Design a protein with these regions (language model features):
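Oxidative protein folding and maturation machinery
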Residues: 1-201
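Short active-site neighborhood of thiol/selenol oxidoreductases, capturing the structured segment around
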Residues: 203-235
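Thiol-based oxidoreductase modules, predominantly thioredoxin-like and allied folds used
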Residues: 241
Length: 241
């Protein structure tokens, strides 16, 4: 099957063999298997998946470096993002996630590679309808958020997703993206007014105007929260030390 062919190709390159004829036979067999699968699946639901999952199959000799490069370059070549059958499954989302995380460049840091791969993903689905772009980018954005890769999640939002959501008038998604960014680690906190009381004197100021100490602790709490009622007094005593 195709998985066995992929293993054979990997073993050939790892062995550093110079037998180009043997490699050509592997590629030929791989193409034959692909064509046979497509022929048998013609007219069925499986046809869309088999065609979309077709790997890069060289029609001539390629060394290991060329093969890996072309494997990445051709990753999306046979995928139709507007195919209703593919859209009805998780195939498209799994493919883009596998690409972003699996096709990293060892000469780059992971975060740099992720961003470069995200650009590739968006370019690959440039002909897709806006709703499909929003759906797939949201899944990718959520994946980054779940992995605490906040800067990458915000990159997806800032570069592509937020504009698409605004154009589609998806207020819920716009709100979610905006709230996530404003509460992300490293994001400058929004300024707000507050009161300072020393003895009987209360003065009004802003968060941005606090400059008498190197660090501040800002606590948001509620009298309806049992943990807050227990721990706020403890914090008050702690800061007196």
């Amino acid at each position: 099957d195709m998985e066995a062919m992929s293993q054979s190709i990997g073993e050939f390159f790892r062995s550093e063999s110079k037998d180009t004829l043997a490699l050509a036979k592997i590629f030929k067999k791989q193409l034959d298997i692909q064509n046979e699968f497509e022929k048998k699946a013609k007219g069925t639901i499986a046809e869309s998946f088999i065609k979309a999952n077709k790997p890069h199959i060289p029609d001539g000799h390629e060394n290991a470096i060329e093969y890996v490069r072309n494997l990445k370059d051709c990753y999306f070549s046979y995928i139709d993002f507007n195919d209703k059958t593919l859209q009805s499954s998780n195939f498209l989302s799994e493919k883009i996630i596998s690409y972003v995380f699996g096709m990293t460049d060892e000469n780059m840091g992971d975060l740099v590679s992720y961003r470069a791969n995200i650009v590739d993903v968006f370019d690959a689905m440039k002909e897709a309808k806006p709703a499909i772009k929003i759906s797939l980018l949201t899944i990718l954005w959520q994946q980054m958020a779940d992995l605490s890769l906040e800067s990458t999640a915000n990159y997806i939002s800032d570069t592509y997703l937020l504009a698409l959501a605004e154009k589609a008038q998806d207020k819920k998604l716009v709100s979610e993206l905006t709230k996530f960014k404003t509460t992300s680690i490293g994001t400058i906190a929004p300024d707000f007014s507050l009161e300072k009381t020393f003895g009987d004197i209360t003065t009004k100021t802003k968060l941005s105007a606090l400059n008498t100490d190197n660090e501040y602790v800002i606590v948001f709490w509620s009298s309806a929260c049992s943990h807050c009622m227990l721990e706020i007094p403890q914090l008050k005593e702690f800061v007196k030390m």
